[in-house]
Amino acid sequence: MASEGKVLLVASSYYGPFYPDGMNTGVHFAELLIPYQVFREAGYEVQLTSETGKCKFDDHSIKKSALGEVERDAFDNKDNEFWYALKDIKPADKINYKEFCIMFIAGGHAAMFDLPHATNLQTLAQQIYASNGVLAAVCHGPVMLPFVDDTKSPEGRSVVYGKKVTAFNSTGELVMGVSSALRERNMQDLNSLFREAGAEFVDPPTPMSDFTQVDGRIVTGVNPMSAKSTAEAAIKVSQSLRKT
């Protein structure tokens, strides 16, 4: 079967202290796995990348209590093709943007640490978007988007300027008990970050709702429960572009 195209699946490179209980944050397991599976099942090739070519999973995201049946099956089966794709993760500076029709950015609080400063990933996102590609992100993954320039904007604005977007919001941070951990590190909540970038931030009904926003070629989702729907929405947008 011919490939539908190629997706660049982005993970944070950060793995380190964050949670009040002493556990480390990293890329969220389900937010990397589920989009990978959605894209593969739809016939896309998937290349994993991070700024440094390395990633580790958020400690909380791989606790047994956090894994649903699909995630548990993949986590326990190291012959699952996801693990082979993970071994082939490449640093962002080794990626050719011309190969990709979709960039999908996974979350986890780790994204807050490195994606705002991940200049090689930001450049790739800028190039893919300028080439009529789709930028999709879920949970904390959207944190990178305000730092991605829209090259077609004469004012040098970001790709989310004037766009409706969503992400893990300030209410969610309160529910998780990590608002103070963000403040201690001078990290803005995503509501504030997007509004400063000129985007229209759309809050979900609840922090745990499966909720996405699509505005042009920008696709965003709120949380791990939205990983599947966000990836599916990105596919729908990308396929619609072929027909125009």
Swiss-Prot record:
UniProt subcellular location: Cytoplasm; Nucleus
Keyword Nucleus among UniProt keywords: yes
Top enzyme class: lyase
One Pfam family, short name: DJ-1_PfpI
Coiled-coil region(s): none
InterPro entries per UniProt: Class_I_gatase-like, DJ-1/PfpI, Prot/Nucl_acid_deglycase
GO biological process, one term: cellular detoxification
Main subcellular location: cytoplasm
Role played: Catalyzes the conversion of methylglyoxal (MG) to D-lactate in a single glutathione (GSH)-independent step. May play a role in detoxifying endogenously produced glyoxals. Involved in protection against reactive oxygen species (ROS).
Family: Belongs to the peptidase C56 family. HSP31-like subfamily.
Protein name: Glutathione-independent glyoxalase hsp3101
Species: Schizosaccharomyces pombe (strain 972 / ATCC 24843) (Fission yeast)
Gene behind the chain: hsp3101
